[in-house]
Amino acid sequence: MSIYDEIAQIVGPENIHTDYIERLCNSRDMSVHQGIPDAVVYAKTTEQVSAIMKLAHRDKVPVTARGSGTSTTGAVLPVRGGILLDLHNMNKILEINKKNFYARVEPGVICMQLNNTLGKDGLMFPPNPGSEIIATIGGMVSTNASGHRAVKYGTTKDYIKGLKVVLVDGSIIETGSITPKTSLGYDLTRLFCAAEGTLGIITEIICKLEPKPEYGALALAVFGNVNAAGDAVTEVTTSGIKLAGCEIMDKNSIKVVEKALGKDVTKIEALLIMEADGAKEVVVRDMNRIGDICKKYNVLEYEWTDDPARREEMMRARGGLVPTLSRIKPGNRLVAIAEDLGVPSTKIPETIRRAQDIAKKYNILIATFGHVGDGNVHTTFVCDVRSRDDWNRLKPAAEDLVKTAMEMKGTLSAEHGTGLTRAPHIALQLGPAFEVMRKIKQAMDPDNILNPGKMGLEKGKKADLYDYFTFQPLVEHPEGVNSYGLDIDNEVLACIHCGFCRLGCPTFSVTQRESKNARGRNALAYYLMNGSIEPSRELADAFYTCTTCQACTYFCPARIKVDEIVEAVRKKLYKSGYVPEPILGVRDNIIKMNNVFASAKAERIEIYPPALKEKAKKGELKAKAETLLFMGCVPSYLDMKMVPSLLKPLDAAKVDARARNFTRKTL
């Protein structure tokens, strides 16, 4: 019996997948890397995780934990194969203690869902990454994630009181305490924060909570000079004003979202979005003080509001920036390889200028934005991922950005973690302390089973920025080995694998499998396009189970045309002879009966209002009408009472209408 047969006995055969298609669907994240597991395992309890780890430890099989898969650094990719341990089904809020301000949650709980639940009791879990709508608490702990509120509230580690962790040998430990403070022994809770699953598997988290602020306001300040914007922020943050958020966008970023801003941006060099919350009288006073400070630095425009709708409108440009970067030019997309610098807040303007100089030096686009209040600068590349020349220029540009951060006494990763992307440079920042990290890893995981290949922890292997490079086949064959046509190819490449589509996909909702979600299907479309896979029955199952309802596109920040990608893949599958039998049956129904359900037209007419039914039977329905009703397949053949129910009030209102196909035989 193989280890995977044993695991199937632990989690059930429906919760382990070893087929190649499902494994490929779990091989990507938002980074430039890929890693294909040997098995995808869905665990639901700490005991299951413990049993799995005992087997993996016995057989020395690698285990990589994964939540929603939103990493920008490749941290959740199983680059050495083995087990991808998916924890997103461990999603229970186990306890909310309102009096002692803590919550116990499983690692698969989504950040926004937790806050929606807490909000009913006037509480909140402050860290809010840009992916909070899909990010799991376990993933946030593993990377010490934060967000724009970090300037006031700090990062995830500041809100973790304790953890339950499964170690490499399957033993279970609990760290921390629910008490307000403790000074007993080593702070093991912090040790597992930002460890990215290299030391243990987190299966339960005790989150520290805060009261929700009673009032909040947002200010927008527009500057014609980035230095002036930086100086204004410095004075604001050193004048006693406690900002809850402070975002900056440089001229390249502003140009990208010009349409969302709704204004001419030619004279704008920097845009600040500042947030304050707390007691109303204090916030109002601070908003006015911020305006006075900005005027000292020649602000072009300044406004603040406490209206929720206006606040949302003001944040729309910042919120839409990242996905818009993949829509600047067809075939180009954002690339996360040196996108998470952290510098002292006073160094933000100089860092932005240097990033702009680096962009000019290498003739590439770098959009610079970030959480200026806590010194976090996102320097995001945009390039043609098919261009070898672009990749050759990006690499030295990334090296220059790393040097910039080091010269500023900063950090290479402020909130996105280390993973594969930051591994080549981690020793540069940490120095001798990095060897201490390696010794800790060796002591806790001597066989290098837990998330191997990450964080540069392995001695004797020099990490490279393009390790496990997912775009290599495309660089070698930029025309696409199995192109769908340029427009569809560009749609495939525009997807950044953020996973937001999970929120809308009905087939994922039912199956909880990545092959039944838009992100997974797009990964498969990419692998088919670059020649890594061929048409197959399993591939057909992934694409013909898609309803093409476009709910994924609604949730997709970049509005990827997933339905068109699916249709393009289906054409290739059809030409190769791979179409599921039920689909062929639907085709035959349409040919024989003019509808997908093989329903006779006469059966529909029988339930219609008597006068209308008589006219239909005699063929006396008008050929034309002022209003045309197109009801679709379900009302026409399954829930058929919907049509006459609608026709009755229309008749009463004397609306001249007819439902399509009373006189045609196509439906």
What are the functions of these language-model segments?
Residues N522-L667:
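Iron-sulfur-cluster electron-transfer modules
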Residues K92-I96, Y102-E247, I449-N451, G456:
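FAD-binding subdomain of flavoenzyme oxidoreductases
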Residues G431-T545:
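Ferredoxin-type iron-sulfur electron-transfer modules and their immediate structural context
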Residues A75-N91, L118-L123, G147-K157, T182, ...:
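A glycine- and small-aliphatic-rich helix-loop capping segment at beta-alpha/alpha-beta transitions
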Residues M1-D29, R58-V61, I293-E313, E407-Q429:
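N-terminal accessory segments
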Residues M1-K54, T70-F101, G130, S253-L261, ...:
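N-terminal flexible segment immediately upstream of the FAD-binding catalytic core
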Residues T18-N26, C207-P211, A217-P396, T404, ...:
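C-terminal substrate-recognition/cap domain of FAD-linked oxidoreductases
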